[in-house]
């Protein structure tokens, strides 16, 4: 049998709590109940009033109406005892619920014949908990003896003064001295109570310890087989990413923000001259889109304002670019066409764009040539010279090669 060395898991503790196996410091609960009763007794118990009620009921006699006489006694008892009993019950129930974390042990209510097993009874008789209870009982005997000695030294004058006290004060003095004795006993027993709670907590976790095989089995039952779930997750991610990869590869360019948003734009003037949102991803997926686009040679334009505007105005993938963003998108397309033409060493291709998308100065916005001044070509530029920010700044792409199409464009 494997040695149980692993700490109990949260599920193990929850299952044990449903069976009634929870950490219970019963002596601390008893201390709270006794302290509550001792402190509440002087306020709730008035012996003078109780004696007067007894005299009144006894003087009426039971000959005339025995039923009413018995009912009067029962009513007096409930009126005296009910508040005190309810207060002590609440003081004991609340700590017990806190210790069990407000878990109701439903399974422990069922009748269990295994509890009558004599073998288990012998094991409990010679268990560590039985030894702990035996030592605790001896310590309580010593605590009680110490309490009596200290009480006698402190209040012996008050005890002997009871013989000379007036009858009206006798009951009150008895209650005060009893409360003092109880509180003194609880104070002396406090170290034993703390030690008992610590040992009980250790034994509780010791009984619920698990071996490594149990931990693995519990993980498989709660989370499922790790290898199967990982494989399913990988297959799902591959199926999910293939569609996005295809959309990225078919896009004319990717506009980024630069790391939190990635928008793919696709234009086919032969069908519809309006740009189309083919990819719309954020955060980690946006970074993956940018990396895949760079690997496939799809231009990546880092334009914060344009990326945010398209993301805000085009809330869904596979939708047309908003009218407010068409001008900016077409400026990027014209710029990319000029960059590709410059890398090939030929004239820029004719861009089939709507009239409203032609680069022009409007509302204080410079035309494309001014907005992308770093990418403009001087008149004396030699043929085949690469535009700045287009591809590698060290070596332009050779004729006929794939143009380097990643750059920064701030429209």
UniProtKB/Swiss-Prot annotation:
Pfam families listed in its UniProt record: Bac_export_2
GO biological process, one term: protein secretion
Keyword Endoplasmic reticulum: no
Membrane topology, as annotated: Multi-pass membrane protein
Keyword Chaperone attributed: no
Species of provenance: Burkholderia mallei (strain ATCC 23344)
Composition-biased stretches (Low complexity): 370-404
Residues covered by region (Disordered): 341-411
Keywords: Cell membrane, Membrane, Transmembrane, Transmembrane helix, Virulence
Role summary: Part of the bsa type III secretion system, is involved in the intracellular replication of invading bacteria inside the host cell. Probably necessary for the lysis of the vacuole membrane and escape into the host cell cytoplasm.
Family label: Belongs to the type III secretion exporter family.
Stretch forming the signal peptide: none
Cellular-component GO terms for this entry: plasma membrane
Gene3D superfamilies referenced in this protein's UniProt entry, alphabetically: 6.10.250.2080, secretion proteins EscU
Transmembrane segments: 28-48, 80-100, 137-157, 175-195
Protein name: Secretion apparatus protein BsaZ
Compartment(s) of residence: Cell membrane
